[in-house]
């Protein structure tokens, strides 16, 4: 059978999913809520821990192949796309707590006008990072689900449930997968011709 992620990498991955989910659920609705010193301190501590964990997670997880568990060779274009999505997710997950800490710092320094240049910019970065993280995570989850449907082994290397036992026999999924492979092959030919 193909390689699988280690138990520690699975724990890090799924614990972080819970932490991210908690961060979304507990987010503040209005900047004026930061007038509550206890809430402000909690937000600063949460953002600091979140940031440290994102960086530690990145440093730990980068040692693993992008498609660990794949039973078949993965096209280079697919690898680059996946790495781009992963890099984007990490960038968003670093910008979220960083901009959150900047918002808290600006707020404590008296910058409470959300329309102000500096605070408005930082709030914009924070909101954009959150929105982009939703999109990139949705792409990541969608790709993982498609991997499970294809039965290519990638899902099984990280997800502890609904493990696949081999490639699918479903003709519809096979057709989509074949089209996907053709697109990757055309993209590789395109980029190879540009290098010449």
Model regions and ranges:
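Membrane-embedded alpha-helical bundles that constitute the cytochrome b-like, heme-associated redox core
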Residues: 1-196
């Amino acid at each position: 059978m193909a390689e699988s992620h280690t138990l520690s990498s699975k724990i890090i991955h799924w614990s972080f999913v819970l932490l991210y989910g908690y961060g979304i659920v507990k987010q503040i609705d209005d900047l004026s809520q930061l007038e509550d010193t206890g809430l402000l301190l909690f937000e600063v501590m949460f953002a600091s821990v979140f940031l440290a964990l994102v960086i530690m997670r990145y440093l730990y997880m980068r040692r693993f192949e992008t498609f660990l568990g794949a039973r078949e060779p993965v096209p280079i274009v697919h690898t680059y796309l996946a790495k781009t999505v992963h890099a984007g997710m990490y960038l968003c997950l670093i910008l979220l707590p960083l901009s959150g800490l900047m918002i808290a710092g600006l707020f404590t320094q008296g910058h409470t006008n959300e329309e102000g240049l500096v605070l408005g910019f930082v709030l914009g970065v924070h909101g954009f990072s959150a929105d982009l993280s939703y999109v990139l995570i949705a792409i990541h989850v969608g790709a993982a689900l498609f991997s499970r449907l294809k039965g290519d082994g990638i899902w099984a290397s990280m997800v502890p449930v609904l493990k696949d036992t081999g490639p699918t026999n479903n003709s519809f999924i096979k057709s989509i997968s074949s089209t996907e492979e053709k697109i990757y092959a055309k993209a590789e030919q395109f980029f190879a011709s540009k290098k010449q």
